[in-house]
A protein has these predicted regions:
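Active-site-adjacent structural elements that line small-molecule/cofactor binding pockets in enzymes
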Residues: 1-250
Length: 250
């Protein structure tokens, strides 16, 4: 029971809008349900967004764990892991051929800016950790309490130096010194406690943290401004020497 209906907008047109509205931030999904999309179509759509954004796309791919969605697409829920692997293979092959100019009669354009697009496995995606480490560029998992998060990150680090990522559902308190209060998949906390907590996650080897502001009770722009002014600079100063793993896209 995920307790939500997912993203309101379809991610691909939404990413096109964001690509035209921004200049520097990375754009990503967390994630598109790959077994419910044709991989050739998705490869074309993703490459288009990547080209329009100047190479800023990170493509997070999930297997989809809501059985009720699959009948609408005539897809086999029980084979979603196999379909996922095949989709990744097809997209990688298409982008490689496009980047090398090896598609002649039915040319695939545009090619991704850097020849390929970073693929992030969202959740387990019905795959073994070994397969994910070999075939994907990063792994993102749902948030657990601090000690559990450290253990999960260590398991990934044992098999891969590729980036390990997590979501953190955040309700940022107005009081910067508000204590850390766990909520489902995240926390209610002030900026001071948030900085401390994110520092701990970075020291555990977590390279990227996706802050989900959906549970928040404050204006989103105010929250983003506070994080930008009070949290990110302090976090950068504290974690400058942390070996958090390779970056996905500079």
């Amino acid at each position: 029971d995920f307790g939500d209906a997912g993203q309101v907008f379809d991610p691909i047109p939404y990413l096109g809008y964001l690509a035209a509205s921004t200049e520097r931030i990375l754009l990503g999904t967390a994630g598109i349900v790959l077994p419910l999309r044709h991989p050739v179509t998705l490869a074309k759509e993703a490459a288009t967004v990547d080209a329009l954004s100047g190479g800023r796309l990170l493509l997070g791919l999930a297997s989809g764990d809501r059985p009720g969605e699959y009948p609408f697409f005539g897809a086999d829920f029980d084979r979603r892991g196999e379909t996922y692997r095949e989709g990744v293979r097809v997209m990688r092959e298409i982008w490689e051929q496009a980047a090398q100019g090896r598609i002649d009669q039915d040319s695939f354009l545009p090619a991704p800016v850097d020849g390929t697009i970073p693929l992030i496995g969202i959740g387990g995606a019905q795959q073994s950790p070994a397969w994910a480490a070999e075939n994907l560029d990063a792994h993102m998992t749902y948030h657990r309490a601090g000690p559990q998060m450290r253990a999960v990150a260590a398991q990934w680090r044992a098999i891969s130096l590729k980036p390990f990522m997590t979501n953190l559902y955040l309700d940022l308190a107005e009081n910067p010194d508000a204590p850390f209060e766990p909520i489902r998949l995240g926390a209610r906390v002030g900026t001071t406690g948030l900085t401390d907590y994110l520092t701990g996650l970075a020291s555990a080897g977590i390279a990227h943290i996706n802050l989900v502001l959906r549970p928040g009770r404050r204006d989103v722009e105010d929250v983003m401004e506070e994080i930008g002014q009070d949290v990110i600079p302090a976090l950068r100063a504290r974690t400058a020497s942390e070996p958090a793993g390779a970056d996905i896209r500079s």
